Amino acid sequence: MNSNEIENFIYLNNTLLSEVPEPNSVFYTPKCFSNSKLPHQSDLEEPSSACSLSKNTIIDGGADEPYDSSDSCATFEFADFFKDNLDDFALDGPIININHVNQTSPYTHHNAEPLHDLQTFSSNLNHSNNRRQTICNFNMANDASKENETPYMVLNNKFNPVLTTEYTQQHLVQCKMVLENHITSRFPHFYTKLPDVSLVPNNMPHYPDEVTAKSAPKDDFYVPRFTRGHGISKLGLCPICSHQGEFIWLRTKTSAYWYHMNFVHGIHSKGRPYQPPIEFRTVRLRKTRNAIGVPNKKYMIEGKCHQCNKWIRCQGRKDVSVKIPEIFWWRHAHRCHIITTDLR
């Protein structure tokens, strides 16, 4: 190969790589979408004469030269190709993501659209052209009283979840199974409702010494709202017991008030209650040798901690009645749980 042939070859390659041809000059036939390639046709060969392009269109740049409309090859229509080759592909309108098909805002007073017309997407990829598939059925009236009602998940099958606000037998059975594992009646103080400690308790008795009222945040259940005395003899009124009809005064300079709030009510010194166990289980205790006095229990209830993810004993080993059965869990929570005052 002489120098002239090498220069022509380099010029031809640079022209083909540097210039981007027009779509109508490349996709001149639907056969171009076929992945099949003839064995006798190489990469550098020109297209067949049956449907060829002008030399100026490819070699001299393509984009710079005008396209010859009198050519035997007609302009390829992309819309016709996609309609014929893609199943259920919508060309009209904007591009739609399969994960966000026909999303609408929920029912509000400003946008009075009923919830039962809410549309969502199906988990089946082979969806049909019918876009109004209702997978979430909201059977509720369009009134303000039920606007914020939380729907319940009912799994009819694993491929068709249905959201509804009506209780069904299957939902009640599932709730019963969950309550048996996560809530127990043996520890009632875990689930008692705390009073509004910012209010003055009813029928508060009068005391000979001066009672000082102290302001504190509404969501702080630890700080006493009323105190008596000064110095080491300073007493604080338990804010929770006072709303339950019991006026218990405890020393604040010693650990009496702190011990009462932590291990009687389960309130941390930062003002937040301790988190109860996220799950319960019953385990069998091993027999101990040389047991003296009260016999040990045969079974033990354990609770799972959300912080350390461990099973903690919620009862004592001895088979005796305890005045505050939650004290065993609150002792662990005081050492393990991270209490924060940020509610955001």
Curated annotation (Swiss-Prot):
GO terms for biological process: meiotic cell cycle. PANTHER family: MEIOTIC EXPRESSION UP-REGULATED PROTEIN 26. It comes from the Eukaryota. Keywords: Meiosis, Nucleus. GO terms for cellular component: nucleus. It is found in: Nucleus. InterPro entries: Rua1_C. This is Meiotic expression up-regulated protein 26.
